[in-house]
């Protein structure tokens, strides 16, 4: 089995991450996991309440994102993952790479604020 490729698309909000990730997934014919798609699905299923609820769903979103990511990597599947990953994400991605070796390729999106 070859070592899977993990394309990590990251950057601040409104920097074009999702647009780029969707285009890459289409062009490379790779599955795509996006944080916002997971969170929207949770909101659609569980509803909206207040800021505290949103934070709980945000934590659950990352838990599910890493769960899906781990399942794909365990199966040797190359894929794209998109989120505004923070510093805490590095340790989780390193942990996954130790268990399920993958070839990382990170794309960091930025915008000048005028877009």
Where are these regions (language model features)?
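Phosphate-binding P-loop
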Residues: 1-4, 73
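Hydrophobic "anchor" residues on beta-strands that sit immediately upstream
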Residues: 6, 32, 78
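Conserved glycine(s) of the Walker
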Residues: 16
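Conserved substrate/cofactor phosphate-moiety recognition/catalytic segment
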Residues: 19-74
């Amino acid at each position: 089995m070859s070592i899977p490729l993990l394309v990590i698309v990251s950057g601040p909000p409104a920097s074009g991450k999702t647009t780029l990730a969707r285009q890459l997934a289409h062009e490379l014919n790779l599955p795509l996991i996006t944080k916002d798609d997971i969170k929207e699905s949770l909101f659609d299923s569980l509803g909206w309440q207040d800021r505290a609820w949103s934070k709980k769903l945000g934590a659950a979103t990352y838990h599910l994102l890493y769960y899906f990511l781990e399942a794909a990597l365990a199966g040797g599947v190359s894929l794209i993952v998109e989120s505004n990953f923070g510093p805490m994400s590095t340790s989780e991605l390193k942990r996954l790479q130790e268990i399920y070796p993958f070839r990382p390729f990170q794309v960091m999106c930025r915008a000048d604020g005028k877009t």
